């Protein structure tokens, strides 16, 4: 019976911890900063009881407000810095995974294909050679020349190879 009672308490604790509002409240950095500030203020007032004198009471209140503002800025800076690091790491993971997806593994890099206008400009700059003899109309192209590859096969070779 005692073991069942302890197991029930542990199960209840797990249910409370996994409850959505409780879980997200401790993931919110602003709420964490407020909790830490409240704990520091409680400790501050427990150690230093404010004096009864009115002038000293005002000075103590000013010091308390300065401490509150300083702690909030400190928590904001530290938590914002940590969140920025997490955000930058997650962005780098997204960038790296998109590069791997683009090149399908990252090892094989597909060279960019130059547009046809660039190759035409290069050919126009060179002087054209005119053959010396007459060319028969039924002549076949030389065996050295390669046949043209369809453009789709150049862009997406993986679809045609499979």
From Swiss-Prot:
Gene Ontology, cellular component aspect: host cell membrane; membrane; virion component
Tree of life domain: Viruses
Membrane-related topology note: Multi-pass membrane protein
Keyword annotations of the record: Glycoprotein, Host membrane, Membrane, Transmembrane, Transmembrane helix, Virion
Coiled-coil residue spans: none
Keyword Transferase applies: no
Glycosylation sites: 88
Renumbered residue ranges of the record's region Disordered: 112-149
Membrane-crossing residue ranges in chain numbering: 28-48, 60-80
Nucleotide-binding listed as a keyword: no
Subcellular location: Host membrane; Virion
Protein family according to the UniProt entry: Belongs to the asfivirus B169L family.
Protein name stated in the entry: Transmembrane protein B169L
